[in-house]
C-alpha cells in the first residue's frame, strides 16, 4: 500500500463540497483535487477547505483538471442533474447517463487506473454505466448504493427503541430508490433479532420505520431542496475503508455475478471493500419474501438500464 493517498472529486455541488469537507474533518487522504464545470467554484472551495486543514491533518487541496486523475487512487463522482421535488431517482437517468459518459471518458483518457466511487443518481444504473464506459474491472467500480439508506434504517430503529444506532445491525438492500427493502430477517439489536425487540403487535411500527427510511429523501428535498450531508458522510466512510485497506463490510452498489440469483447488474448489497476495491460480496440467506423483493428491485433496474444504455450505443 502506497503512503500517499490521492482523491479526485468530480462534481462540486452540495454533495461534492460536503464530501470534501467531511474528508478534511475526518483526516481522509493526503491530496484532494476538485473538478467541476464551474472552475471558479472549485478554486473558491479549494481555498475555503484549505483554511480548515490546520484544524485537521495536512492535506493538499486544489482545483484540478482531468489530467490530474492519472495517478489518483480514487475518483469520486457526484456530478449530475439534481433530483427535483416529485421526481424519482430513476427519472434522472436519461439526463445523467450522458453526463457520466463524458466524465468517464475524460478520466480514462488521463491514464487513470484506480477505483471509481459513484454517488450520482440513479446510482445503481450510473455505476453500471461507469463500469461499461471505463473498461475497468468490476471490483474497481463501486456505487454508494444503499449505504445512506442503511444508515437511515439503523437510526430509525435506534430512535424507536431508544438505543445507540451503533448497536443496530441490518441492511437495506436492492435499488437505492423506491424498490429498496429492509432485510428484516438479518436485523439485530445488541445481538438479538429485531423480533425480540419489536413484538408482532408492533408490526405496524416496523412498516412505518421502513417507509420513513425509503421516503426520507423526498421529504428532505421538499423541505430544503436537496440531500447532501448524509450521503457525503457515507461517501467519506467508503473512502476511508478503501484508502485504509480496512476490509470493511458496507452496503454498496456492486456487480452481481450469480449472487442472489442475479447476473450482470449493479445493485445494493453488503460487500467487503479494501484498497483493491470490492474483495467479496456478502450473500445473505434471505427469506422468500426478501428474495422476491430483491428480484423485483433488480427487474426494475434492468428495464431502466437497458433503455438507458441504448441511448449511448
Curated annotation (Swiss-Prot):
Where is this chain primarily localised? Answer: cytoplasm
Return the protein name: L-lactate dehydrogenase 1
Q: Which residues form the active site?
A: 176 (proton acceptor)
Organism of provenance: Listeria monocytogenes serovar 1/2a (strain ATCC BAA-679 / EGD-e)
Residue positions binding beta-D-fructose 1,6-bisphosphate: 154, 169
The reaction(s) annotated as catalysed by this protein in its Swiss-Prot or TrEMBL entry are: (S)-lactate + NAD(+) = pyruvate + NADH + H(+)
Kindly report, in one word, the top-level EC class recorded for this enzyme.
oxidoreductase
Question: What positions does the entry give for NAD(+) binding?
Answer: 15, 36, 41, 66, 119-121, 144
Positions carrying Phosphotyrosine: 218
A GO biological process held by the record = lactate metabolic process
Question: In which residues is substrate bound?
Answer: 83, 89, 121-124, 149-152, 227
Pathway assignment: Fermentation; pyruvate fermentation to lactate; (S)-lactate from pyruvate: step 1/1
Subunit structure as annotated in this protein's UniProt entry: Homotetramer.
Amino acid at each position: 500500500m502506497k503512503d500517499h493517498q490521492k482523491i479526485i472529486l468530480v462534481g462540486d455541488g452540495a454533495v461534492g463540497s460536503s464530501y470534501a469537507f467531511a474528508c478534511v474533518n475526518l483526516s481522509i487522504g493526503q491530496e484532494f483535487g476538485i473538478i467541476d464545470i464551474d472552475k471558479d467554484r472549485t478554486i473558491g472551495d479549494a481555498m475555503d477547505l484549505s483554511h480548515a486543514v490546520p484544524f485537521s491533518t495536512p492535506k493538499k487541496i486544489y482545483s484540478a483538471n482531468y489530467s490530474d486523475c492519472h495517478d489518483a487512487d480514487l475518483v469520486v463522482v457526484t456530478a449530475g442533474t439534481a433530483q427535483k421535488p416529485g421526481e424519482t431517482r430513476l427519472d434522472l437517468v436519461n439526463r445523467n447517463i450522458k453526463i457520466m459518459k463524458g466524465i468517464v471518458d475524460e478520466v480514462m483518457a488521463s491514464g487513470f487506473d484506480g477505483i471509481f466511487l459513484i454517488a450520482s443518481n440513479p446510482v445503481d444504473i450510473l455505476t453500471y454505466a461507469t463500469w461499461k464506459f471505463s473498461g475497468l474491472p468490476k471490483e474497481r467500480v463501486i456505487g454508494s448504493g444503499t449505504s445512506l439508506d442503511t444508515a437511515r434504517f439503523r437510526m430509525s430503529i435506534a430512535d424507536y427503541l431508544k438505543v445507540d444506532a451503533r448497536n443496530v445491525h441490518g441492511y437495506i438492500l436492492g435499488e437505492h430508490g423506491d424498490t429498496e427493502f429492509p432485510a428484516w430477517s438479518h436485523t439485530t439489536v445488541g445481538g438479538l433479532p429485531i423480533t425480540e425487540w419489536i413484538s408482532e403487535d408492533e408490526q405496524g411500527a416496523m412498516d412505518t420505520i421502513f417507509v420513513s427510511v425509503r421516503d426520507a429523501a423526498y421529504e428532505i428535498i421538499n423541505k430544503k431542496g436537496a440531500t447532501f450531508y448524509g450521503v457525503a458522510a457515507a461517501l467519506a466512510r467508503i473512502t476511508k475503508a478503501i484508502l485504509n485497506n480496512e476490509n470493511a463490510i458496507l452496503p454498496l452498489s456492486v456487480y452481481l455475478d450469480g449472487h442472489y440469483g442475479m447476473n450482470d447488474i449493479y445493485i445494493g448489497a453488503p460487500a467487503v471493500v479494501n484498497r483493491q476495491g470490492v474483495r467479496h460480496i456478502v450473500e445473505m440467506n434471505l427469506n422468500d419474501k426478501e428474495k422476491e423483493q430483491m428480484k423485483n428491485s433488480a427487474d426494475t433496474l434492468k428495464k431502466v438500464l437497458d433503455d438507458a444504455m441504448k441511448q449511448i450505443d
